[in-house]
């Protein structure tokens, strides 16, 4: 089993159905409309968001969030992952009645619990949400810059790509960049190549969340390759959300063949009936990646990770040791 690393997963979207059911029992909520036969059920983007929001609202206390992070990273480690970055949302903290700091520190505590048991390293990317608004995104950036938690190492923007313009988020990313945080932004998923180009022009990230619609513009693909931008690809998510009709249509192999740096990620794994392990299995089955190619994908992820040099070197040493 190849060692794995993940750069793109939303922590609220990583809550496994069995954990959500336990949380629902704790708070007296009925999961029947959203979980059936041990799986999340939804039929379009609106119903997906409804299921997601229902589950997210079941995490309300610091211990709830610590349990969530511990549960997810421990499950990743069981599947061979040695590194995990998760997107966190101060907006979810506010909805839960927690301060962003209490929420973040609780998630960090869960990560440390998982590390103590399994050795997995975890980091957080504080994330603003497009459809919540520019002011909220800038608040998230200011929080990320000053929160003081050593596991917060990145800043990003997610949410509905159809809302807002990249120019709107320049100040937020300036705040994050000045604080030394790694920069990533969702683009080129539900919208076309234009959002990827706008992100490169205005935000100047080192990584793009998804970015797969760049395949629609050969000049943009060349630019991504030339600039060494790392794509956080999520094939299982893309098929579940009908960004592409099938894995045979997915552009990851073409992007890689064009010289783009690609990684494998699960996005919101239980909602898309996937996992990081399954993403690696998909790459093996549908993209003809052998063990060496999969190890190279993991290496790309670790090299692009928002983590200090010492930890990165240790992760690469683990990967090199496993490859011998």
From Swiss-Prot:
Residues where substrate binds: 268
Highest taxon of the lineage: Bacteria
- GO annotation, biological process: adenine catabolic process; hypoxanthine salvage; nucleotide metabolic process
**Cofactor notes:** Binds 1 zinc ion per subunit.
Write down the position(s) of the site called Important for catalytic activity.
Answer: 210
Q: Per the record, what are the reactions this protein catalyses?
A: adenine + H2O + H(+) = hypoxanthine + NH4(+)
Q: What class of enzyme is it?
A: hydrolase
What is the name of this protein? Adenine deaminase
